[in-house]
């Protein structure tokens, strides 16, 4: 409240509420978040709850995690409980944070938990995650129609690394799986054909109706655009470029954050406008944007955070430009590193 924040987005830990993923809930876990909500409201700070930000109960992971369709039932029960306990005080719920990240890096590339490189399980994840969102949406709305519900997606314009046909085709594939595997079914009611052809056997009757709810908003996380290169070793045949490859294209000393992410404000504007134009001009919450830079305390005991200030200025100008061009931006949340 001292820095006049109007809203605070936080994640609830599923294992903290249901240590086994299901069954009896943990009252101490519920009480912790209840106290947090009460304190936020005392300070007139609007809470935004994210139900899943990658911490999965181990017993559910032992049964296949997101690759097992049964997870949709457990996530629905968890979502319902949170809505019952907190829906009187929190009116903005985000079901899932960055499905493309935890599915791709967890089940296809093996960078994140559970560390798998399994294309079949990855494809199952896509459909199960979409279903989980749809079921959770319905369960939350059954508690109160006044609760606003959406999903936060990590999206970015994709660029082919070169003009070769291989890289151009790789870019199309990567862009489809990264940017549209979740947004299209959730907000348009259908999968892109390249994905539908691969998961048709997983889609049961009424699945698409469950997935395609009347979402109240889209949450957008954005940090950089993506340069895509063809790679036969990757299970999709496409991947984002590494730092060595990137250095051949740009001056990495001037155009990267300390996490080696490109600084391209125009990409932010383009992604916001893509949401506006492709998904029928939805309400958009900009749920994450920010940068990582080294902080140094000077002789006066201050941090002259010039790079971060300049980054935020440029990206907020991109947001303002999108608003002037009709995008319905409802909030902007800085992600601090």
Predicted features along the sequence, with ranges:
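Active-site-adjacent substrate/metal-binding segments within catalytic domains
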Residues: 1-33
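Active-site region of glycoside hydrolase catalytic domains
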Residues: 20, 30, 34-337
